[in-house]
Structures are given as C-alpha cells and as structure tokens.
Curated annotation (Swiss-Prot):
Protein name: Lipoprotein-releasing system transmembrane protein LolC
Keyword Protease: no
Record membrane topology: Multi-pass membrane protein
Function comment: Part of an ATP-dependent transport system LolCDE responsible for the release of lipoproteins targeted to the outer membrane from the inner membrane. Such a release is dependent of the sorting-signal (absence of an Asp at position 2 of the mature lipoprotein) and of LolA.
Phylogenetic placement of the source organism: Bacteria, Pseudomonadati, Pseudomonadota, Gammaproteobacteria, Pasteurellales
Transmembrane segments: 25-45, 262-282, 314-334, 356-376
Length: 393
C-alpha cells in the first residue's frame, strides 16, 4: 500500500520510541484524556437520553398530549378527519381542574370524562364490556388512582365532593364553584404521580358540570406517537384552539433538556483540556526533531509536506483516543445496568439510550479539535530553516 510520504513519516514518528520521555508522556496523557473524555461524554449523554425518554413515557403517557377544540362544543358522534400521520387517534374528551373533598382530606387534581376505557392509557386495562357498569351515564361515578384514594381516605363505594373552580353558580350567599357528589366505583393502580391527582368519569357527567350538553364534548384528545411533535400540530389545525401537555409539564422537560445540554458542555471540557496536550507534545516534538526536519527538507521534502507530517501526527493521537473512547463508551453504556448493580447492589434502575447522531457529533467534535490543535505546531515545524538547524550538527 502506497502512503503519502507525510503520512508515512508521521506513522514512523508515532510508533518510534522517542528519547524525549517527557514529550512521550505528554502525548500518552493526551490520548488517555481523549479516551476518558469521549467515553464519559457518550455515557452521560446516553443516560440523559434514557432519563428523558423514561420521563416522557412515564409522565406524558398519563396526561392528554393535546386537546383540539372549536369555539363551540363538538359532537361526540363526529370524528376528527384528516389526522396527521404522527397522531395515533383522536377521541372526544371533557376535562377540567377540580378540587376533591372528603371528610378525611382535600386535594387538587384533574378529572377526565371518557366514553370508554380505551380513551385513556391509565384505565385501558379495565374490562371494556363493564364500562357502563363502572361509569354509567347519569350516576356520577368515579374511577380514581390508588394514591389519590390514600390522600382522601376513601375506598370503593365512598363519596367524594368535586368542586370545579373554573365554573361557578350564583346563590343567595354569592358566587360559589360548581360542585357535585361522586361515588368511587373503582380504583386504578400505579402509573407514577398521575394516580395521585387524575380521576375518570363518564364524559356526559363531566359535561353537565361544565355546562356542556349531552352528546357534546369540549374537544378532541389527540394521542401522538411522539409527544415532542406537538409543535407540528398548529399547521394541521390552523383554525382550532390547541391545548397541549406543555401547559402542565413544559417547564419540567425544558429543565431536563437544559440539564442534558449543560452536562454535555461540562464533560466536553475534558476533551478540550486533553486535546490541548497535543499542542504541547507536538511543540516538544518539533524542537526535538529540528535536525531531522532540516535533513528531510534538504532531500526534497517541501514545507507543506512538513506541515502535513505534524498534522497527521496530531490526528493519529486524536483518532486513536477518540476511537478507543467511543468503543469503551458504547460498551459501558450497554452494560451500565450491570456495572451500577456491581457498584451499588440496591436495585438502582438507570435507563440509557444510545443516539447514533450524538455519537457522530462527539467523534466529529473530538477529531475537529485534534485537527485544530495541530495547526500551530505544524506551522512552527514548516518555519524551520535547514541552514540554521544544521549549523552546529
């Protein structure tokens, strides 16, 4: 295989045992720093991706991704047509913020009116054929979460007073919130924090409290394949009002994303510091190899080829460090659960998600910095004059 002369000389310098032990030590430290930096950056970004995906699955699966509504209530028998490809389905919904009150406690939450158990992932495991038994129309019954039941101290068959602060009625004592007694007909379990504030009732019963006529609903609830595609909805529903999950959880996910970006920035500084050692090691090599550079120039090596020798030399250090760091980072990420279990056998769950695009960015970032770090030493090497360098040889 025919290598360019500059690459051939760079390979010889890279593999040769230098008499300058300090320069060799600096080069090895640069490679080690790049390995650790790239590995740490891939692991941290993968963990942050996993945590973001886990939070998206746990938090956003339990709340409406989006509600599309008109100026007037929509008919529950009418379907929403021309759905975007990223929308799984659309179902009628009545939902509002409420205050739950019992003799044993008070709690704020959200009530969702549904037509069947398949309308919400929190209760879709219930027997669909028993919907009219559990949430019959006109009987004002509720299905609540286990955490909410504990807060209010209620069980199946107990009464809960629901107060809707958004709607009110006038009485001789002034304006008071709409309220109604509901009976707990069943309890759902799990699903994180949602079971502490979300309850379900027949869509018609909630509509009555919201002053919506029977056979009508507040709007359509949309289920998206990816909740983060919510920004594409306005162009598909330009005339409708869209309320989405960002009202409730937008700040939380902005904080998660900012944390991921800041962690990536801080870890990337490790790579920057490590690659700065390439400048030092190449500068020492230029001083050490001045005589050889001069001899090569007298034998026909041009200044551009001299520059290429040291550019290749720095890129070799950066490439080897980046490649090893990427391999170790991927291996550590794939086995992170076992590693964490070995270090802390308390059953800690740490979700991870490797992103090919992020890996390419990390590798490209490391190689680009490696290239930039070679420019000054390569320029200094090309400035060596054979006559001056060989004057005392």
């Amino acid at each position: 295989m025919n290598f360019p002369i500059s690459l051939y000389i760079a390979l010889r310098y890279w593999r040769a045992k230098s008499a300058d032990r300090f320069g060799r030590l600096v080069t090895n430290l640069a490679s080690l720093g790049i390995v650790l930096g790239v590995m740490a950056l891939i692991i941290v970004l993968s963990v942050m991706n996993g945590l973001e995906g886990y939070q998206k699955q746990q938090v956003l699966s339990s709340i409406p991704h989006a509600i599309v509504s008109e100026e007037q209530p929509i008919s529950t028998e009418k379907t929403l047509e021309n759905l975007p490809h990223f929308v799984q389905k659309a179902v009628p919904i009545n939902t509002t913020n409420v205050i739950y009150q019992t003799a044993k406690g008070v709690s704020a939450g959200q009530i969702i009116g549904i037509q069947s158990f398949s309308d919400d992932p929190l209760v879709e495991s219930f027997d669909q054929t028993k919907f009219n038994e559990i949430l019959p129309r006109g009987e004002f019954k509720l299905v609540i979460g286990d955490q909410l039941a504990q807060k209010l101290g209620v069980n199946i068959g107990d009464k809960i007073r629901l107060m809707i602060t958004e709607n009110s009625q006038y009485t001789p004592f002034g304006r008071v919130p709409m309220q109604r007694l509901f009976t707990v007909s069943d309890i759902y379990y799990g699903y994180g924090e949602a079971s502490g504030y979300e309850a379900f009732a027949n869509i018609t019963d909630i509509g009555r409290l919201m002053r919506i006529q029977p056979q009508q609903a507040q709007g359509y609830r949309l289920f998206l394949n990816d909740p983060f595609q919510i920004t594409e909805l306005p162009q598909h529903f330009p005339t409708q009002k869209i309320t989405d999950w960002r009202v409730q959880k937008g700040e939380f996910f902005q904080a998660v994303r900012m944390e991921k970006n800041m962690m990536g920035l801080l870890i990337s500084l490790i790579i920057v510091v490590a690659i700065s050692n390439i400048v030092t090691s190449l500068s020492l090599m230029v001083v050490d190899k001045q005589g050889e550079i001069a001899i090569l120039q007298t034998q026909g090596l041009t200044k551009s080829q001299v520059r290429s020798v040291f550019i290749y030399q720095g890129l070799l250090v950066g490439f080897v460090g980046t490649l090893l760091g990427a391999i170790l980072g991927v291996l550590a990420t794939l086995n992170l659960t076992d590693i964490v279990s070995a270090v802390n056998p308390q059953g800690v769950f740490l979700p991870t998600e490797l992103s090919f695009v992020q890996m390419i960015f990390v590798i490209g970032f490391s190689l680009l910095l490696s290239l930039l770090s070679t420019l000054y030493p390569a320029y200094r090497a090309a400035k060596v004059e054979p006559a001056a360098a060989l004057r005392y040889e």
